[in-house]
Amino acid sequence: MSVEEQFKTSAEQVKKLKSSPSDTELLELYSLYKQATIGDVNTDRPGMLYLKEKAKWDAWNGRKGLGKEQAQELYVKKVKELVEKNGLA
């Protein structure tokens, strides 16, 4: 299975986890997913009143320069860890 196919499968598996990942894990997944699908952050940083959006933006921006395939590989690895930890519903 190609990295792209593994990535798509992992994106579906995340929706089926028995328990929700921690906020830190969710930010990691979000940043890797955005980097893998869009690339480097392409929007302005949200203002200080938008705490959740700012945290997501910061996490994504922290992946700046990471290639698509590498981001996909890291995403697949993280999802595998979460599946082992939480199981699938």
From Swiss-Prot:
Function: Binds medium- and long-chain acyl-CoA esters with very high affinity and may function as an intracellular carrier of acyl-CoA esters.
Species annotation: Hypsibius exemplaris
Keywords: Lipid-binding, Transport
Ranges where the ACB domain occurs: 3-88
Family designation: Belongs to the ACBP family.
InterPro entries the record matches: Acyl-CoA-binding_protein, Acyl-CoA-binding_sf, FERM/acyl-CoA-bd_prot_sf
GO MF term set: fatty-acyl-CoA binding
GO-annotated biological processes: fatty acid metabolic process
Binding positions for an acyl-CoA per the UniProt entry: 15, 30-34, 52, 56, 75
Leader sequence residues: none
Gene3D superfamilies reported for this sequence: 1.20.80.10
Name this protein carries in UniProt: Putative acyl-CoA-binding protein
Tagged with keyword Ligase: no
PANTHER family the UniProt entry points to: ACYL-COA BINDING PROTEIN 1, ISOFORM A, ACYL-COA-BINDING PROTEIN, ACBP
